[in-house]
């Protein structure tokens, strides 16, 4: 079973993803709240995260700039943790392009659009 830290700004989406991951039987999900002085790298280390799933949006705390700083810190602290970004390719195509570029540049291990099915998302995460 993989430990997955879920850091998603939208509470409803976060809860739905956590429920989906729990129900798959392949993950032990942990929700990390977005707070001004939080340190996701420390949280991931404390929770022995195998995967960190982050959303990227225009909202404060979830911007691409913020998320790239966070993934850099996690990569330095826990090099084996897989870094995964989730974004909405329809409402934020510019963010989606930035996320694709982050993957191309090796800054993250994978990305998903929020339009994917839950079956695909769980299967792809399990394969990391």
Regions of interest found by a model, annotated:
Residues 1-5, 9-20, 117-128:
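Non-catalytic signal-transmission and effector/linker regions of two-component phosphorelay proteins
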Residues 45-47, 74-80:
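Conserved phosphotransfer cores of two-component systems
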């Amino acid at each position: 079973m993989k430990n997955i830290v879920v850091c998603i700004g939208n509470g409803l989406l976060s809860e739905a993803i956590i429920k989906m991951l729990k129900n798959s039987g392949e993950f032990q999900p942990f929700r990390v709240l977005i707070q001004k002085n939080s340190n996701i790298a420390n949280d991931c280390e404390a929770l022995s995260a195998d995967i960190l799933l982050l959303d990227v949006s225009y909202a404060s705390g979830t911007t691409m700039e913020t998320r790239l700083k966070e993934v850099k810190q996690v990569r330095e602290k826990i090099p084996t943790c897989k870094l995964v970004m989730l974004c909405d390719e329809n409402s934020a195509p510019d963010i989606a392009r930035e996320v694709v570029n982050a993957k191309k540049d090796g800054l993250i291990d994978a990305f998903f659009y929020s339009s994917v099915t839950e079956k695909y998302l769980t299967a792809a995460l399990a394969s990391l």
